[in-house]
Amino acid sequence: GYFLEGFLFVKRFKWIEGANYPDGGCNFETFSNEDMLEVESLGPLVVLGPGQSTSHEERWSLHRKIPTIKAESDVDQYIRRLL
C-alpha cells in the first residue's frame, strides 16, 4: 500500500505456494527515486507453447480520510482493517 495526505492506495495480488517466481522467489519488485515509489507485482514463471496464454490479476482499492500514521499502533487501528 501507499499512503499520502489521507488517502491509502492498496494493491493486492496472489502468491501461489510452490510456484517458481523470478528474482529468488519474489512476487514483487520495488523501484524508488526522489519522485516516486513503484511496487510491481510479479506472476510465477511459466513456459508457454504456441497459442497459449497466461494472466496475472491485481486488485486495487483506494481509501480516503485515513488519519496520519504516527505510530505502529496506528497501523493496527486504521490500516489492517482495510486489508
Model features per residue range: what roles?
Residues 1-55, 65, 69-77:
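A contiguous, surface-exposed recognition patch within enzymatic or periplasmic domains that forms
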Residues 59-61:
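Short, surface-exposed secondary-structure boundary micro-motifs
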Residues 77-83:
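Short, cationic low-complexity segments
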